[in-house]
């Protein structure tokens, strides 16, 4: 072949190749979008199991408590009141949200009039409970100065209520020192018990769930989170315990609105203190009640005795899902138990030689080092770590926002450096004695006094200067989820510089105790040290050494406990010296008071939603302040990188619209060391987890709130593991008889990112620091401008360019039919044509170059090839 022919052939192949490649790539992108749209459309039509059990009642509706008296002095105040309870069926130990509208605004400051009182009651009568069946009368002692006389109690004052009976049934047994004393109360009758006048044997201010006073705003609306207790938390109510019929006992949520008129017709302003008086259990106040029936899920296991048992272990992120699935899995003939343990311990069980060790562990990160035998990872749930909060607006005197004083704050923004400050006791209020020594004396008292926090949350600039949380509540122990939080913090250059001792632009420095820990260089950091050993005592009456960090800022038992404490606004600090205690010691001051609560905790999204908590918007590496929801978690999952068979978040990657603390939990199974029975049971479990277990809903067996259902490709991965476990031939091929494995597990690795998408044009070394301005923000839009602090001197290390989610590759799952067209088959053909075009595009220039060489040899080089 002469040079001219080679040149012509090469040119022709180049043109054909470039054309075919461009056309094929364009069509691949188009069909990829169609495939993704089909997958999203498929998932969007899934119906929730159990349906919506929210219940709304109008006070004027006579269907439950009968007709209201239009001549009642409070009729006008309550006639437009409408209350909604967010969930009334399939209840467990959780919170429900009570919202209302049409009320009159609560008096400013104290709860003098026009507020709601909420309680939980038992009662088997279909008409609802009687006052003696309600858990009421053990308020926080600090509330006595905020409400009227007896409004927080069960006690009655003779003659105060014309409709109330003052008889022997309501008489309090007189003390021996005054046998003629006549005092009255509404007794409490526990389920299955006799009436008592002293409730202390059944509930106290520390255990009750009663809401003494809930504020109505100037617009007539209000909201409150009500803890719902089962028979496990409140045996005296018996909610959810099995009746003789086998059905779980139902209970009631009762709302008693308080107006501006006392039971005897006098106005509240004429009472001592200008407040409405009298117990909500007295006859007149009780006649104003609204009752909501509550249906509970059965308490305890419903699996039949004699079932085969399989013990599963894993982390806390999976606990809520497994609790929901367990009873539904009983029908498989196997009882699946679940032990919540640390991730490292769960991984170690997979390779343990101890009898009874589980061969299925739910973890967030793979075994490291990888064992000799094959371990398969099946995605089971995806959720997020969140910072949940209960914060009441506490405005300064004269604030322009004072009309909302005492209502719930509904937006909070935190960036990595603020979280670093909270985790390192760098605010003076988080150190015993208030950090009176150098250098902490120059730091803000609490996060509310931090200019960086105010820049992100300008509304809180009008809070009183004494407002602030009892620290950021965190759990004891280690967790892969905690490691992910630290990676998010340390990946931020401003937070990293702060932890290394650099002051922020306002002069605040890290607590030096934590600077000495060198947290930024600890690759295995997966817990929250409380390293400041300072102690404090108020005076000489308190024995040395006084109280310490663990008294002031105690750990929570786990993330669920953290959520529960946040809902109650009770961190459990024990810093009040009680000389009457035997022996004398530090005690808790109890929960924060309504209207002045400021509580924050690190927890999981499922627990936060179970307890009805708001969650902070966290600043991601792209500079956006985002809350955890289905969209932001999905964006994070789509951008995850693969590490040894699992997908994890790369904290250095800048992904727009992605919530930074999104996590995927995997069921890890060492295929060869699991027995045949175990593999079969694990396969059954995984198939349930990948099908019915991914349908969101309230019913047992559904996917609880706080979890993002698995995508199609993830369900395919899960099914592949289940199929392997159920295939003896595949197992035999994977596990030759000669193979042995006795490895040990050790802490999970720090993930190494792999190229997953087209690099983001914005360098990753640009700090995210004080991030997106508060306010609602579209995850797909650029963040609003925010104050940028002075760049720290050290943290500018280069990192790998991050993928841009707008142009990055998408992971393809199995073909999905849409509109009657097999998109997968079409894509396969396009892949082939694109590949052929690429080959032509490569071969063409090669032939042209060869023609040039041959022409040189022949002495026929033409000028257009020079």
Question: Where are the regions a protein language model picked out?
Answer:
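Ser/Thr/Pro/Gly-rich low-complexity linker/stalk segments immediately outside membranes or between
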Residues: 32-42, 853-858
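Secretory targeting and sorting signals
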Residues: 2-37, 100, 833-849
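Flexible loop/hinge segments at secondary-structure junctions
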Residues: 42-69, 73-753, 769-789, 794, ...
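Short helical patches
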Residues: 6-9, 857-862
């Amino acid at each position: 072949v002469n040079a001219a022919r080679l040149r012509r052939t090469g040119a022709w192949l180049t043109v054909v190749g470039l054309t075919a490649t461009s056309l094929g790539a364009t069509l691949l992108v188009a069909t990829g979008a169609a495939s993704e749209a089909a997958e999203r459309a498929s998932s969007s039509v899934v119906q929730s199991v159990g349906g919506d059990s929210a219940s709304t009642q109008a006070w004027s509706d006579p269907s439950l408590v009968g007709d209201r008296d239009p001549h009642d002095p409070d009729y006008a105040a309550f006639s437009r009141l409408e209350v909604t309870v967010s969930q009334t069926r399939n209840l467990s130990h959780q919170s429900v949200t009570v919202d209302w509208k049409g009320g009159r605004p609560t008096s400013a400051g104290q709860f003098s009039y026009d507020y709601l009182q909420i309680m939980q009651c038992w009662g088997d009568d279909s008409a609802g409970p009687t006052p003696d069946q309600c858990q009421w009368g053990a308020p926080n002692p600090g509330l006595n100065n905020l409400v009227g006389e007896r409004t927080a109690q069960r006690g009655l004052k003779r003659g105060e209520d014309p409709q109330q009976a003052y008889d022997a049934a309501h008489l309090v047994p007189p003390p021996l020192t005054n046998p003629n004393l006549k005092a009255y109360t509404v007794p409490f009758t526990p389920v299955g018990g006799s009436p008592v006048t002293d409730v202390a044997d059944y509930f106290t201010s520390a255990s009750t769930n009663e809401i003494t006073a809930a504020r109505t705003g100037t617009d007539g609306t209000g909201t409150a989170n009500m803890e719902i207790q089962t028979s496990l938390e409140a045996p005296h109510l018996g909610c959810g315990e099995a009746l003789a019929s086998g059905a779980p006992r139902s209970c009631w949520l009762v709302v008693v609105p308080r107006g501006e008129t006392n039971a005897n017709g006098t106005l509240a302003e004429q009472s001592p203190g200008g407040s409405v008086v009298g117990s909500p259990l007295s006859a007149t106040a009780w006649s104003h009640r609204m009752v909501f029936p509550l249906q509970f899920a059965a308490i305890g296991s419903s699996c039949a005795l004699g079932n085969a048992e399989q013990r599963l272990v894993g982390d806390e992120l999976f606990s809520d899902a497994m609790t929901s699935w367990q009873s539904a899995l009983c029908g498989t003939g196997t009882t699946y138990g679940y032990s919540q343990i640390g991730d490292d311990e769960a991984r170690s069980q997979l390779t343990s030689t101890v009898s009874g060790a589980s061969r299925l562990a739910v973890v967030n990160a793979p075994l490291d080092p990888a064992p000799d035998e094959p371990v398969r990872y099946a995605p089971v749930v995806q959720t997020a770590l969140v910072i949940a909060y209960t914060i009441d607006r506490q405005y300064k005197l004269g604030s322009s926002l004072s009309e909302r004083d005492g209502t719930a704050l509904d937006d909070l923004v935190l960036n990595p450096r603020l979280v670093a400050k909270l985790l390192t006791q760098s605010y003076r209020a988080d150190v015993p004695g208030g950090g009176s020594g150098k250098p902490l004396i120059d730091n803000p008292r609490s996060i509310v006094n931090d200019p960086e926090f105010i820049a992100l949350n300008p509304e809180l600039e009008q809070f009183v200067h004494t407002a602030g949380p009892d620290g950021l509540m965190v759990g004891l122990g280690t967790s892969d989820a905690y490691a992910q939080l630290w990676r998010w913090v340390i990946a931020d250059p401003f937070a990293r510089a702060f932890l290394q001792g650099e002051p922020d632009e306002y002069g605040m420095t890290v607590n030096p105790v934590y600077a000495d820990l060198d947290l930024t260089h600890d690759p295995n950091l997966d817990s929250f040290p409380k390293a400041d050993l300072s102690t404090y005592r108020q005076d000489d009456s308190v024995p040395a050494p006084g109280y310490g960090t663990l008294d002031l800022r105690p750990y929570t038992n786990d993330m669920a406990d953290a959520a529960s404490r946040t809902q109650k606004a009770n961190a459990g600090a024990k810093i009040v010296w009680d000389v009457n205690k035997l022996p004398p010691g530090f005690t808790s001051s109890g929960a924060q008071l309504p209207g002045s609560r400021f509580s924050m905790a690190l927890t999981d999204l499922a627990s936060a939603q179970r307890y009805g908590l708001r969650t902070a918007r966290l600043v991601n590496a792209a500079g956006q302040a985002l809350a955890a929801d289905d969209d932001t978690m999905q964006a994070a999952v789509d951008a995850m990188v693969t590490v040894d068979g699992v997908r994890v978040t790369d904290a250095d990657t800048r992904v727009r619209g992605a919530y930074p603390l999104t996590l995927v939990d995997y069921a890890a199974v060492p295929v060869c060391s699991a027995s045949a029975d175990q593999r079969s049971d694990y396969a059954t479990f995984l198939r349930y987890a990948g099908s019915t277990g991914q349908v969101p809903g309230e019913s047992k067996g559904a996917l609880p709130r706080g979890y993002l259902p698995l995508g199609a490709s993830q369900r395919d991965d899960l099914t592949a593991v289940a199929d392997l476990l159920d295939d003896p031939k595949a197992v035999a091929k994977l596990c030759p008889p000669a193979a042995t494995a006795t490895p040990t597990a050790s802490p999970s690795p720090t993930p190494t990112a792999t190229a997953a998408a087209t690099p983001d044009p914005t360098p990753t070394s640009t700090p995210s620091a004080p991030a997106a301005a508060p306010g609602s923000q579209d995850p797909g839009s650029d963040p609003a401008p925010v104050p940028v602090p002075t760049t720290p001197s050290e943290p500018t290390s280069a990192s790998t360019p991050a993928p841009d989610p707008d142009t990055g590759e998408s992971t393809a799952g199995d073909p999905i039919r849409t509109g009657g067209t097999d998109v997968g088959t079409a894509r396969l053909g396009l892949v082939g044509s694109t590949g052929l075009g690429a080959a032509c595009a490569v071969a063409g220039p090669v032939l042209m170059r060869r023609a040039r060489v041959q022409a040189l040899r022949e002495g026929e080089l033409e000028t257009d090839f020079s």
